[in-house]
Amino acid sequence: MRKLMLTGGLLMLAGCAGFGLPRHDPTQAWIDLESHQEDTALLAFEVDNKAATDKRYFEVQPGSHELTVRYQFPVQPTNIGPDAQPLWRDCQMNVKFNDFNAGERYQLQAGNIGFRPWAKLYDQQRKVIGQGTPAGCQRS
């Protein structure tokens, strides 16, 4: 019985290992997503007003693109009032960049200050090359 459980566990781990991020296509630009704070979610939403294929990253042709991300975060009680509970916000932000290059990796980071979300796009040298503009928020 132990061998069966061990074998089953190893097979499950091996199966999960295949569900990571796909290989980066060198003819495309790759944009990693990273939320800057705990208890948040940053998801790829749209590229040029078309639904993103995978919510974990963007992969785009070289050139100009507008990326839309969905950022979910809690507003802490210290920003609301003394007896308040955290308030969850669900926001979209657009980041436009005119010069994505094939084979390069970019990073899109998001965070919030109180009720206001922010997003920044970085190149491989960690230089800020784009800023997010709000595209609407709602309570979630």
Task: Enumerate the predicted regions with their spans.
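Short loop/turn and low-complexity linker motifs enriched in small/turn-promoting residues
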Residues: 16-140
